[in-house]
Amino acid sequence: MFTGIVERRGRILRPGRRLAVETGWSDLAHGESVAVSGVCLTVARLKGSAVEFDLVAETLKKTNLGALQKGDSVNLERALRHGDRLSGHLVQGHVEGTGTVVQSGKTLRVETELAAQMIPKGSITVDGVSLTIVDVEPGAFTVALIPVTRRITTLGRVKKGARVNLELDVMTKRPGKPSRITREFLRRAGF
């Protein structure tokens, strides 16, 4: 479990199925869980503060980790320990899908089919960052980014068109399957 409070940014040393990340942590253990841009991964190999993680097909399909390039930044958070404070919300690291950034800056607007399961003022994890949903509309949602979030996380540098990992808060998401009616669907249908 995680909180969505990013501890630091890491740098991709080697992309791919055996993802290598410079974490800045020298005290990680083999088998430890780390959220990498919101995705719960298990430490497979350590060399100083460089860590390797194995990515399976489902991870590559559901997340943006397969699109990472050498030198890219990722958000990092270590797993909760008993007695830690819960400053964000409970995050499993089980990304449900991705969204596309359509507006960035002090607010972030993301298009995704998962919006149908969201509620305003509910929590969401975007690339591992715990955020409060400001607004929900068909096929999209908006969150506000405070200065510390823009400074510490990758969201302060995210560009329009980028894919971001999304995990809905299990306590506030709406039940049911997301609607397949998106802006693109409506546009193609002539609306």
Which residues fall in each region the model found?
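Conserved loop->alpha-helix
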Residues: 1-191
